[in-house]
């Protein structure tokens, strides 16, 4: 009755593991949220015959079947030798329809990691990898020792259940697969550990986000924390969210942001108004000039300061206004500069804005978008026709420092540059030419040359070559990371593609989306 997803662990390749996780993810997903991230099905709509997924894993000496709850993608137990072993926080009646003829055995621990600590090592002390997963399956197949069972389940949870929920974890596993029969190990790092722990909180806050921003979620270890407070930070690493609620998608949502259908008629998420920085071109912040709040004062781009500087903190109100110290962001006419003014005395339509999920801020009355006409500090903002240019991209956030990361692509090779060219090469930890800085304006810049941006050579049309060139705030250098692993040019919808799936050509091109592995990227 229940869907079955098989995986032969000892024969794993990057392709077979990716296919396995994709099939599992597709079985779990109930649609795409308005934020562009897939989520699990609405529990209220799940029929009894749809409540579980059976994951059939083959190890070196035997096979077991993991039982997954489709409501939360958690493991409930496993079947081995016609005995169904289940966690002690899972009632036998709740899984009565799963293998009804099998014997039942309740394990002495629950499904959460805190409950397993008395039986298995701490997570950051447990090696993960394909060989370790195969041995984990064998432990579940033959062992009656609770410590061995707990260790096996921890590894299965990390490399199967959690990898289905997080592209970041899937990427860690992929990178551990060197080739057929050639596997490395890894241990959970701070990001893996914390996103798993904070998954429910992330799901709630993302689905309750307003204009892409949400209340910050602390990640990392307590001794070295970092924060996510914007959908753009999560969309590349989070594959599935718990179903919490939704808000109806606005007519202004970009079709390039959401590839699949968007759920509708779901409970509406409560979301509050957001006060944060608005970060844009070249990583600078929207700023009321010289911290003076008189009517008509100009709004400019300026290096981001601290949260103590009121002239860079903006409140995005539910009435469509964007306010700094109570004054509204506005323009006298589309041809003139952006400024602040008393919200109650200015022409109301000129004070109304829509903040699109793709980072565009549009004034509906004029049909034009907020633009930083140059990259210089102190440049006054204005309105221009929407070109989906990097000069027209914004992020509402309290994290003003750009993200620095590697970008891993086809064959688990790293994106690299050393001048104007862009290609894939073997990943080398710490290599500056493989470290990329992701700016709020949608540009992708090599850490070794921050004045250059990845861009299409000419327009981003099919087969256009991707090059590393001087940043100009143009549409051909504005990119969007989607939830499926694509790096999308917002203007044309083309994605970065390893030409002919052949890294030896040393060429990345723009191409229509087809979803094959040469268009899949991991951060």
Curated annotation (Swiss-Prot):
A carbohydrate binds at residues 287-291, 300, 305, 311, 358, 398. The active site is at residues 74, 113, 162, 165. Disulfide bonds join 245-269, 285-304, 328-343, 414-427, 453-471. One of its GO terms (molecular function) is toxin activity. Keywords: Allergen, Disulfide bond, Glycoprotein, Glycosidase, Hydrolase, Lectin, Plant defense, Protein synthesis inhibitor, Toxin. AMP binds at residues 111-113. Gene3D superfamilies: 2.80.10.50, Ricin (A subunit), domain 1, Ricin (A Subunit), domain 2. Residues 251-265 form a propeptide. The keyword Disulfide bond applies. Expressed in roots (at protein level). Expressed in seeds (at protein level). It is an enzyme of class 3 (hydrolase). The keyword Zinc does not apply. GO terms for biological process: defense response; negative regulation of translation. Glycans are attached at residues 358, 398. InterPro entries: Ribosome-inact_prot_sf, Ribosome_inactivat_1/2, Ribosome_inactivat_prot, Ribosome_inactivat_prot_CS, Ribosome_inactivat_prot_sub1, Ribosome_inactivat_prot_sub2, Ricin_B-like_lectins, Ricin_B_lectin. Its EC number is 3.2.2.22. Residues 270-397, 400-523 form the Ricin B-type lectin domain. In the N-terminal section; belongs to the ribosome-inactivating protein family. Type 2 RIP subfamily. This is Volkensin. It comes from Adenia volkensii (Kilyambiti plant).
